[in-house]
Amino acid sequence: MTTLHNLSYGNTPLHNERPEIASSQIVNQTLGQFRGESVQIVSGTLQSIADMAEEVTFVFSERKELSLDKRKLSDSQARVSDVEEQVNQYLSKVPELEQKQNVSELLSLLSNSPNISLSQLKAYLEGKSEEPSEQFKMLCGLRDALKGRPELAHLSHLVEQALVSMAEEQGETIVLGARITPEAYRESQSGVNPLQPLRDTYRDAVMGYQGIYAIWSDLQKRFPNGDIDSVILFLQKALSADLQSQQSGSGREKLGIVISDLQKLKEFGSVSDQVKGFWQFFSEGKTNGVRPF
């Protein structure tokens, strides 16, 4: 064992103030110098330092995971708030539709189904309305009605899940449906063109336009007894407003193509009506002896 010399008392050896450490306890020691004196670090100390380092690493890793989870939750809540704000902005312009959303009745029915699943809740909403923006609006109403109802905490949690799911998976679909609702509702008041097909046609034109033939086929299917010319005019006005709100980008170019195709369809529809009228004129024998062939 190294003898430490005290500068104040000459070379007198220092007396040991504690028993000698057994040789088995000082195995794998690390030697070094500290301020001119020999020091020893027992392997147990090294292990303690390693254990502390490992624990600190684990704690920081755990905090990082929690931070990511909180960030994801925060992003989801922000998305729900953004969609909700736009839905309220547009649907509030059509109070007639809001009156149909009897949240109290909906809450009463759902509170009697304690084991309802997320998919069942969505299916129930689809049964109340086929329009995603109205479904989302109903969920927001349910969420607000459930505040301060701890006995329905399971349902409140389910509604929050549904809101996050819809906002993330159908956000654009919901917002576009809400945005066009005031104009589509006014157009539907004539009793000729139904509200939901108007919303769906506009939404398809913005989100997934497939070309002039596809949109013509959709118009024929969705408005078999409607006034297709007025539907085309409705779409032209709505898309032109969207075009003016966009300064640049691929979205603006796509809207320009759709509007151009709609104009062609309008002209084609006019010619088609003339041909039908011409054919009916001949088939009824109103041609002074000239008969249809």
Swiss-Prot record:
Its Gene Ontology cellular component terms are:
cell outer membrane; cell surface
Among the Pfam families in the record, one is: HrpJ
Task: Give yes or no: UniProt keyword Membrane.
Answer: yes
What is this entry's stated membrane topology? Answer: Peripheral membrane protein
Q: Which GO terms describe its biological process?
A: negative regulation of protein secretion; protein secretion by the type III secretion system
- What protein does this entry describe? Outer membrane protein YopN
- What domain of life does the UniProt record list for this protein's source? Bacteria
What InterPro entries does the record tag this protein with? Answer: HrpJ-like, T3SS_LcrE
State the NCBIfam families in the record. LcrE
The function of this protein is: Plays a major role in regulation of the low-calcium response. Seems to sense the calcium concentration and to transmit a signal to shut off yop transcription when the calcium concentration is high.
Query: What does the sequence similarity comment in the record state about its family?
Result: Belongs to the HrpJ/YopN family.
**Keyword field:** Calcium, Cell outer membrane, Membrane, Plasmid, Virulence
